[in-house]
Structures are given as structure tokens and as C-alpha cells.
């Protein structure tokens, strides 16, 4: 029996203002949610907290993986940097810090961090979500 291995990806990225270099929440800039991703060529996009998340279709080869990554990223670039009079840019930093006043103004649901549910591999008990 042949086993076929596929590879995918689901990275998160942040959005910044090109004028102030401050982070901007993706929650009202792109479609899709964790529960209802917005399907695009090569995968899907969705909001994950304040970040923009994308995932790609399972890929059987390096070229298919890179092609799917390019297609979905191109879609995100068009939605973020191609709109809003190009005042926003995609930021691949691993973390984002928001101005306190701006963060306080965001809806409560975009401030929730972590996976639902998240379990401790050793105790098999559910972890408490991190605080913001």
C-alpha cells in the first residue's frame, strides 16, 4: 500500500499602516473566520483574532506547495495592499503590539488568543487561554 504525504500551511500575518507603522486589526479588512474560511484560489483566508490567517490546499510536491502559497498570498496582497488607497501593508512579524487606546476599541472577540480548545499533552486537561 502506498502512502501519499501532503503538506499544507496556515500562517498568520499582521497588517500595518504605512504612514504610522502601527498595527491594524484584520478583523474588518478581510472575509472569513476560523469556522467559515473564505475560499480563494489555492486555499482560504480568514481573520484569526487581530491577525490575517491563510491556509493552502494540501500539496503533493514542492512546486504545488509554492504555487498554492503564491496564489493565496497574492490574494491577500490584493485585498490589503491593493485596497484602502494603499495605506496598509502586510507585516510578517511573529508578534504585534497595538496602541492601548486602539486595542481597547476593538471588539472583545478579536482579543481572544489561542486555539479552541487547547489541551495539555501531559495532563490531557484543557489549558486556560492566554490573556491579552
Predicted regions: what they are:
Residues 1-132:
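Phosphate/nucleotide-binding catalytic core
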Amino acid at each position: 500500500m502506498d502512502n501519499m504525504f501532503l503538506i499544507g500551511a496556515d500562517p498568520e500575518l499582521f497588517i500595518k499602516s504605512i504612514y504610522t507603522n502601527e498595527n491594524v486589526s484584520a478583523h474588518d479588512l478581510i472575509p472569513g473566520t476560523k469556522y467559515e474560511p473564505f475560499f480563494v484560489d489555492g486555499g482560504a483566508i480568514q481573520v484569526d483574532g487581530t491577525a490575517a490567517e491563510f491556509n493552502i490546499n494540501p500539496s503533493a510536491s514542492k512546486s504545488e506547495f509554492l504555487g498554492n502559497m503564491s496564489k493565496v498570498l497574492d490574494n491577500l496582497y490584493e485585498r490589503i495592499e491593493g485596497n484602502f488607497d494603499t495605506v496598509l501593508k502586510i507585516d510578517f512579524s511573529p508578534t504585534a503590539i497595538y496602541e492601548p487606546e486602539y486595542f481597547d476599541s476593538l471588539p472583545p472577540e478579536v482579543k481572544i488568543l489561542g486555539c479552541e480548545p487547547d489541551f495539555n499533552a501531559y495532563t490531557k486537561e484543557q489549558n486556560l487561554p492566554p490573556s491579552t
